[in-house]
Structures are given as structure tokens and as C-alpha cells.
């Protein structure tokens, strides 16, 4: 796993009985006009499926009537009425935004003057409330015509596609022909005052002007409309979680994300997640794939955020995670390897010698290790490697990873090597 993905995953709040409704993310989507009702639904529902607690859609009244029939899980506010005074709309939007961690502006917004004015009001309110912003689709049309509205707001993520990026470059007087392709997004971010840019393309480039990350994982060959809306919901979710993370709620992970880089890693995680979801859906549906199919694969694609913690230590997948994957992701066909200490006594000696444990944490870790070693003997793992010599254990693990493991190297069927 890349360091960037570890940092993105660190934003994910642990589910805990101590959290109450809304603390795992409250997201809003501004969009949904007379012509477009699917886009805001996909964005908000993607956020719900990925893991936010609450998702609101702020939309035009007729669009709201339709969106309300899609899913009872979404909270729909039909307040962007072209016949209402802009002051009334501003107050209605502010009432909703005041409850949110993040606002996504653009899915299904449209470009008529009224909806563009509503986008401007929403962006202004989000900035005043100091919450995360994701700007996509026709929200970028507004930004392109009102650059100062977003310049310098470092809690924002822009998600331009090829054409939207071209417009931004023209607006900012950037000549792409005079630059390396990989430097264009960084220059856009720099001229926007450090706003995070997620440039969508064959390779997604994510940058805040000083740091640049890339995602080139395979996605879908079918470019059906709506995948960008899934991405905006994913980015909004991780940015909402970043807000929770910055407040120290629901996360005790050792991996620390600099607060100024939260939008960067939120965008990186969203890109990785969406590409994986798109790939899985295309493998299943092929040419007939539509965006609605992706919603069904969001949970499976979300396996990248599986993690476990113990005594405030962070692990990718432990025995608990193996159980989750076996139960919920049977089609992945992974190879499960358990790295075992030679014995509980030897583990205890190692931990005592390390001097990093209190009596209470030592007892807890040994109890947990005993349970996991017993679980390893139930047939749950393809290989059990005893870590009594780090170099030998590494060599055995390397052979497993390369498919070179044999019974003489590593005894399968859960017999300890």
C-alpha cells in the first residue's frame, strides 16, 4: 500500500458506540435542476454508501419532487426556487449548510443564470462557515466565470475533466503547450492560491500546488455519464471525514495527516476508490454498465478502507479484517497469510524488551494475540509463517507473494512452518 493511500485511510473514522448520529460525516450536495436529477442523487447516495451518516440535496423544487422518489435515505431541500427572492434562498441554504461538514457544488446544477447564482451563494456560505468544498461539473462553470470566489480557499477540491481543465487554463492564462503535462494541474492550483485540484484523465493528478500525487489504477472502459458524480460524492465523504479527523473525533490512529493536506489525501482516496469501483462494475457488466450499477459495488470497492486498531496501534488487516473480507468479499480470491510469533511467551518477552507497553496494554495485546493464533489454526489462513527469524520469515512471505511458495518452504493448510 502506498504512503498516500495510508494517509487517505487515516481520515476514515472508526465506528464506535461513543459516536452519535452525524459524527461520521454530514454532507450536502447543491445541484439538481429541471433537466438533471440523476447527478445529485448519484453524488449523495455514493456518499451514503461509502459511509457518511447524513446526506442532503439542495435543489430546484421540480427536481426535488423527482429526487425524493429515488431514495428515502436522502434529505431533499427544494429551496432553489427561481421565483423566490435570492435573500430567501440564501437564508434557506445557510440553514442547511450550518449543519454540514462538507458541501459538494455542481452535480446536475445547470448553467442558467438562476442556478449559477445559487451556486455562488452556496460557495460563499460554505466559505463563511469554514467547511470543506468539492466543486464539480457546472459548479466549475461558475468558478471559471468567478475565479475570485474560490481563490485561496484551501479547504476546496476542484474536480475538472479535460474540457473543464482547458477552460481553467484559458481563464488563468496558462498555455498547456508550453508546459509538461504533469505540471499543468500544479500550476492551476498555484494560481488559485493552493486550492486542491483533482484533474481527471487517463491518469488522475491531485495537487495543492506544492505536492502532487497521481492515480493510474485501472478503471472502466465504459465512460457512462455519472461516474464523475460518484467521484464528487467520494471526495466529499473523505473531506467530511477529514473535518472530523481534524477535530480528533473517532480516530486514534498513529498515522498523522497534516491538517493542511487533508483535501489532498481526501481527493487521492476518492480517485483510488472510484477507479476501483468502476473497474469492478465494468468487469461485471461490460458494455452495458451504467452508473447505477456502480452504487451496488461501492461497498466492495470500499474494502480499501478496511482497517483495525488495537491499543491505539494501526494495522491494515488483522484477524478481524480477515473475517470481514471472508464474509463480505468472497469474490476477491485473496491469499491469507498469518505471521505468528513462535509462542505467546516469546511474544511477551519481545514486548517487554521493547519497553513500549504498560502492564495493561501488554496484557491486552497478549490476550488478543492468543485469540488470533487460535483463529489461525481453524483453517482461516492459506499460510501460517512463524516469525522466529525475520530474514527467513520475509523470504517465505516473498515466495508466497510471488506464487513461488511450496510445501517445503511454507507448509499450507494452516500447518505452522
Predicted regions and their residues:
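A short, charged, Gly/Pro-tolerant segment at domain boundaries
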Residues: 271-275, 407-417
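Short glycine-/polar-rich loops that comprise or flank the Walker A/P-loop
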Residues: 53, 330-335, 379-381
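Conserved AAA+ ATPase "sensor/coupling" helix adjacent to the nucleotide-binding pocket
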Residues: 171-172, 302-305, 350-357, 400-403
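Conserved phosphate-donor/acceptor-positioning beta-strand/loop module used by diverse small-molecule
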Residues: 323, 331-354
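Small-residue (G/A/S/T)-rich helix-start motifs and N-terminal tracts that mark the onset
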Residues: 1-134, 141-157, 162, 166-297, ...
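ATP-dependent small-molecule kinase phosphotransfer cores
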Residues: 292-321
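Switch/connector loops and helix/strand junctions flanking conserved nucleotide-binding motifs
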Residues: 167, 324-326, 344-350, 392-396
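Small-molecule kinase domains that catalyze NTP-dependent phosphoryl transfer to phosphate-bearing small molecules
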Residues: 356-403, 412-417
Amino acid at each position: 500500500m502506498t504512503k498516500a493511500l495510508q494517509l487517505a485511510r487515516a481520515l476514515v473514522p472508526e465506528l464506535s458506540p461513543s459516536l452519535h448520529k452525524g459524527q461520521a460525516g454530514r454532507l450536502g450536495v447543491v445541484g439538481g435542476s429541471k433537466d438533471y436529477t440523476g447527478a445529485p442523487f448519484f453524488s449523495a447516495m455514493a456518499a451514503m454508501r461509502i459511509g457518511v451518516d447524513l446526506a442532503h440535496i439542495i435543489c430546484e423544487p421540480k427536481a426535488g419532487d423527482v429526487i425524493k422518489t429515488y431514495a428515502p435515505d436522502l434529505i431533499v431541500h427544494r429551496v432553489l426556487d427561481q421565483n423566490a427572492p435570492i435573500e430567501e434562498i440564501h437564508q434557506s441554504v445557510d440553514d442547511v449548510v450550518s449543519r454540514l461538514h462538507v458541501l459538494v457544488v455542481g452535480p446536475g446544477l445547470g448553467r442558467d443564470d438562476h442556478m449559477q447564482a445559487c451556486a455562488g451563494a452556496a460557495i460563499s456560505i460554505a466559505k463563511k462557515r469554514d467547511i470543506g468544498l468539492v466543486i464539480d461539473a457546472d459548479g466549475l462553470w461558475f468558478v471559471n466565470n468567478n475565479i475570485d470566489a474560490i481563490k485561496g480557499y484551501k479547504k476546496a477540491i476542484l474536480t475538472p475533466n479535460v474540457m473543464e481543465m482547458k477552460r481553467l487554463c484559458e481563464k488563468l492564462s496558462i498555455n498547456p503547450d508550453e508546459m509538461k503535462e504533469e505540471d499543468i494541474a500544479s500550476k492551476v492550483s498555484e494560481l488559485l492560491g493552493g486550492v486542491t485540484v483533482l484533474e481527471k484523465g487517463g491518469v488522475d493528478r491531485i495537487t495543492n500546488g506544492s505536492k502532487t500525487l497521481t492515480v493510474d489504477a485501472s478503471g472502466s472502459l465504459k465512460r457512462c455519464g455519472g461516474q464523475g458524480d460518484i467521484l464528487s460524492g467520494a471526495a466529499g465523504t473523505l473531506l467530511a471525514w477529514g473535518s472530523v479527523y481534524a477535530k480528533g473525533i473517532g480516530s486514534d490512529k498513529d498515522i498523522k495527516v497534516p491538517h493542511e493536506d487533508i483535501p489532498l489525501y481526501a481527493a487521492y482516496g476518492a480517485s483510488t476508490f472510484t477507479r476501483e469501483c468502476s473497474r469492478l462494475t465494468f468487469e461485471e457488466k461490460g458494455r452495458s454498465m451504467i452508473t447505477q450499477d456502480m452504487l451496488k459495488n461501492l461497498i466492495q470497492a470500499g474494502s480499501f478502507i478496511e482497517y483495525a486498531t488495537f491499543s491505539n496501534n494501526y494495522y491494515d488487516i488483522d484477524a478481524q479484517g480477515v473475517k470481514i473480507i471472508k464474509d463480505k468479499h468472497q469474490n476477491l480470491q485473496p491469499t491469507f497469510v498469518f505471521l505468528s510469533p513462535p509462542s505467546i511467551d516469546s511474544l511477551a518477552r519481545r514486548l517487554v524488551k521493547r519497553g513500549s507497553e504498560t502492564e495493561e496494554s501488554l496484557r491486552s495485546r497478549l490476550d488478543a494475540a492468543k485469540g488470533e493464533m487460535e483463529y489461525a489454526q481453524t483453517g482461516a489462513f492459506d499460510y501460517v509463517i512463524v516469525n522466529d527469524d525475520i530474514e527467513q520469515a520475509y523470504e517465505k512471505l516473498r515466495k508466497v507473494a510471488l506464487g513461488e511458495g511450496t510445501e517445503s518452504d511454507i507448509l499450507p493448510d494452516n500447518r505452522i512452518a
